[in-house]
Swiss-Prot record:
Species in which this protein is naturally found: Shewanella sediminis (strain HAW-EB3)
Compartments in which it is found: Cytoplasm
SUPFAM superfamilies: GroES-like
This protein's name: Co-chaperonin GroES
Residues spanning the signal sequence: none
Amino acid sequence: MNIRPLHDRVIVKRSEVESKSAGGIVLTGSAAEQSSRGEVLAVGNGRILENGSVQPLDVKVGDIVIFNEGYGVKKEKIDGEEVLILSESDLMAVVS
């Protein structure tokens, strides 16, 4: 994938969600939730602070993150894959 996010932006590929319920029923449409987890594909250089210095991001390529898909999250298709472009502040946790 040939994309480089700017500043404190992160490119995330959403993880696939299990499309079956606990009882084995296949879920479709709105019953099948979208995952709020994904893999970090690319990170920007960092957040620019008031004094002009750059604070590096806490996440790195390959991290599995839990994110808040709220205002400011941009969905894009890059090389045929849907990815999310979001700010590091939209990330809630790194799964280890």
